[in-house]
A protein has these predicted regions:
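N-terminal type II signal-anchor transmembrane helix
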Residues: 1-66, 105, 366
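Peptidoglycan glycan-strand catalytic modules in the bacterial/periplasmic cell-wall system
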Residues: 2, 6, 16, 29, ...
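Flexible glycine/proline-enriched surface loops and loop-helix/loop-strand junctions
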Residues: 79-81, 158-163, 199, 221-227, ...
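Short, well-structured active-site flanking segments
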Residues: 107-116, 190-193, 252-257, 505-525, ...
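Extracytoplasmic/periplasmic proteins that interact with beta-lactams or build/remodel peptidoglycan
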Residues: 132-136, 148, 211, 246-457, ...
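Active-site-adjacent helix/loop patches that line small-molecule binding or acyl-intermediate pockets
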Residues: 141-143, 148, 152, 347, ...
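Short, glycine/proline-biased beta-turn/loop segments that scaffold the active-site neighborhood
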Residues: 263, 487-543, 616-629
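A penicillin-recognizing enzyme superfamily signal
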Residues: 345, 349-365, 397-462, 467, ...
Length: 763
């Protein structure tokens, strides 16, 4: 063999070895890839969700609160404000923009787009990662954050496997819907429904093309293309999306050019539980739905009555503790914050808006009067009757009720050190009706500042159905979160008198029955004499009717009626009217020293326009799960309290209160012409102003007063219920009647038969 032949053989041998090595590397690579995918498919390498989890992804959806007129009132959620929507509820603009920009061959591939993948590999990722929408969905749902290079290298193969499985389990429309429901658009806008609401104050179905393009632009990198913090980048990215839509013939060049010329016009609404419509109602609903079964050991001895009330609610009210009483198919209780429930309420968003507007309008004016009266008074905002020591005691008690105090106490600080903190100026935001005030003030002074603001509660419900249409628990939920509709109880004053008059009417008396208008002395159970005062001295000694007595809110006529019955009889009747709080069986009960909530008073007064039948407040009509399955429906609970004839007598007298008595202000100042009844109330020292009014269809109640009973006007004309509370009701009714779409007619009459004659018993 010559040297040439040897060299050729050597080269051939080297080539063979190289080829064998290359084939070996290729085969090994292929086998390695096959092995990796086999291990992934078996769940032995990385996490691969099982079939049942792929079929039922564990999404955390917020619970949505929906008004009677199908408006979203808000949501309950933790961490993620996500609400599920259906494919048919998403604008086609959103779908087209998403496909044109993120995955143009979406309808052609089966989870992995090989063409895009190869392009990404050839260009080393500079042309994008090649991920399909299905892969992105897989990453969103099941790809945890990688902790090392090995885990990061496995992420893509795992996503490919999951994506192919998703494509077999779901239709293309379902995958698009899941993707848009899952994506986080920042600012607590998780999912397309939240994003449409937060950025444009609209729904996914009503997104304009340029709005949809902006949101799709955020899908590439929401932080980088944040329209609030980086508007220029967001605009450029939106225009890129529009170019893509034009490129793939979803829109014409002319449309593209016209839309690109438009600026981004955000209608941003921050997601905050303390903001938005009906915040007090939403919080009330949250507490009721998540209530636990009452345990006696959790209540102090002095609070046993509240335990009995809560226990009765648990046993009789299906809404109370709903999440604990009802379980999902897997046996666990419903989670209000993650299970995506839909709660359909009785609240009407328009009437709720009118109620909040009425509260704000009147409370602003009333607050100005209160500030004027208390200006430069050293004891402000308290009554001039309080001593310095009494004021200090109130302020100390209020300090100890703050979150700041509890936090400092938990840190182990002593009382002296805590007081020093409370008397050290710090930056803070204070409430005012003209907007928040940024200032530097001591926490102690801020407590006193907040005490200057009068509080209120308002609730309106339909007399015959019990449907609660409006609920305002205070002047501003962000600053004053204590609910004065359901939680707070205050002395009711003369609004209690209709119960005693009802007792008399039910026992056979008539509005036209007369008695002497004179001082009455009663003896209570302890043998102590009680003689109430009265303002109507000009009529002293005259014969007056019971109708006149209620019309003028006469204490003497009320005391006369009280002399005909026992306190126990009055307590019993009030219990049947739905009053659950402390009721002491004493003769003075007839003038309203007892503490009652606005909700209870409104509930009770439904008895009058409803022919003697009390209708309990109905807050929710049905609850659905995230798939639209009905979990529960709710109907009004009714109780027959008095006879129809008695209710007719009471309507007659309470209408006269509005036409000629203490409620006449609604007629001459606010111009209300519709048939209506009602009663004002003012507690001792005019600490509490009340008004409960009703029309043939609506019953509404108002309370206004200070945070403490020692905070009140110094004169009766300003502090009476007709001045403090009635105007809110009157403003609300004006707005309700002005909105013809609501269907409340000023010509509607009370359902009193023609044969009824209020004077019949005296003829």
């Amino acid at each position: 063999m010559d040297k040439t032949t040897g060299k050729k053989a050597s080269k051939k041998s080297l080539t063979t070895r190289v080829m064998l090595w290359l084939w070996g590397i290729l085969i090994t690579g292929i086998l390695t890839v096959v092995l990796i995918f086999w291990l992934i498919c078996k769940g032995m390498l990385g996490y691969l969700p099982p079939l049942d989890e792929l079929q039922n992804p564990k999404n955390k959806f917020a619970t949505e609160i929906i008004s009677a007129d199908m408006q979203s009132l808000g949501r309950f959620y933790r961490n993620e404000n996500r609400v599920s929507v259906e494919y048919t509820d998403i604008s086609p603009y959103m779908i087209n923009a998403l496909i044109a920009t993120e995955d143009v061959r979406f309808y052609d591939h089966t989870g992995v787009d090989l063409k895009s993948l190869m392009r990404a590999i050839m260009k080393l990722g500079r042309a994008g990662g090649g991920s399909t929408l299905t892969q992105q969905l897989a990453k969103q749902l099941w790809s945890p954050r990688a902790n090392n290079i090995f885990e990061r290298a496995l992420q893509k193969p795992i996503e490919w496997v999951i994506a192919t499985k998703l494509e077999r389990l779901y239709s293309k429309e379902e995958i698009l819907t899941m993707y848009l429901n899952q994506f986080d658009f920042l600012y607590n806008a998780v999912g397309i429904k939240s994003a449409a609401q937060v950025y444009f104050s609209t729904t996914p179905a009503n997104l304009k093309m340029e709005e949809a393009a902006m949101l799709v632009g955020m899908c590439k990198n929401p932080s980088l293309y944040n329209p609030r913090r980086r508007p220029e980048r967001a605009l450029n990215r939106r225009n890129t999306v529009l170019d893509q839509m034009c490129k793939y013939e979803y829109i014409s060049q002319e449309v593209c050019d016209s839309l690109q010329a438009l600026p981004i016009e955000l209608k941003y609404q921050s997601v905050d539980h303390k903001q938005g419509l009906a915040p007090y109602f939403r919080e009330y609903l949250r507490l009721v739905l998540t209530a636990q079964e009452p345990q006696r050991s959790h209540y102090s001895e002095w609070n046993m009555l509240q335990y009995e009330i809560d226990k009765r609610q648990w046993e009789t009210n299906p809404l109370y503790g709903f999440c604990q009483k009802n379980h999902k198919p897997d046996g666990t209780p419903y989670d209000l914050y993650h299970d995506g429930l839909r709660i359909y309420t009785t609240i009407d968003s328009r009437m709720q808006q009118y109620a909040e507007e009425s509260v704000r309008e009147h409370m602003m004016d009333l607050q100005k009067s209160f500030f004027r009266e208390k200006r430069k008074k050293s004891y402000a905002p308290f009554s001039k009757d309080l001593s310095t020591e009494e004021i200090d005691a109130i302020m100390t008690r209020s300090m100890r009720q703050t979150d700041r105090y509890r936090a400092l106490k938990k840190q182990g600080m002593g009382e002296a050190a805590i007081r020093k903190v409370f008397n050290t100026p710090v930056e803070m935001q204070l409430f005012s009706y003209n907007g928040q005030i940024d200032t530097v003030m001591t926490p102690m002074d801020s407590i006193k500042w907040n005490k200057h603001f009068l509080r209120c509660g308002f609730m309106s419900m339909e007399a015959h159905t019990g449907a609660v249409k409006a609920y305002v628990g205070g002047p501003n939920f962000a600053h004053f979160q204590y609910d004065m509709v359901s939680t707070g109880r205050r002395q009711v004053g003369s609004t209690i008198k209709p119960y005693l008059f009802t007792l008399a009417m039910d026992e056979g008396m008539w509005p036209c029955d007369s008695t002497v208008n004179d001082s009455v002395t009663l003896i209570d159970g302890n043998g102590v004499a009680w003689t109430p005062r009265d303002e109507h001295l000009a009529n002293q000694g005259e014969m007056v009717t019971l109708n006149w007595g209620l019309e003028k809110s006469s204490n003497w006529i009320t005391a006369y009626l009280m002399s005909l019955f026992t306190p126990e009889q009055l307590v019993s009747l009030m219990r049947s009217f739905g009053i659950e709080g402390q009721l002491d069986p004493v003769v003075s009960l007839c003038l309203g020293p007892c503490e009652v909530s606005v909700k209870e008073m409104v509930d009770a007064y439904t008895t009058f326009p409803n022919k003697g039948i009390r209708v309990e407040p109905l807050f929710v009509t049905r609850i659905e799960d995230t798939n639209g399955n009905i979990l529960a429906t709710f109907t009004p609970q009714t109780h027959e309290i008095i006879s129809e004839t008695t209710s007719y007598k009471m309507i007659y007298m309470l209408r006269n209160v509005m036409d000629h008595g203490t409620g006449v202000r609604a007629r001459f100042r606010y111009g209300l012409k519709a048939p209506m009844g009602g009663k004002t109330g003012t507690s001792q020292n005019h600490s509490d102003g009340w008004f409960v009014g009703f029309t043939p269809s609506l019953v509404s109640g108002v309370w206004v007063g200070g945070e403490d009973r020692s905070i009140h006007f110094d004169n009766m004309s300003a502090g009476q219920g007709a001045n403090m509370a009635l105007p809110i009701w009157a403003l609300y009714m004006q707005k309700v009647y002005a909105d013809e779409e609501l269907g409340y007619d000023t010509e509607e009459q009370f359902d009193v038969p023609e044969w009824f004659d209020a004077e019949a018993g005296c003829k």
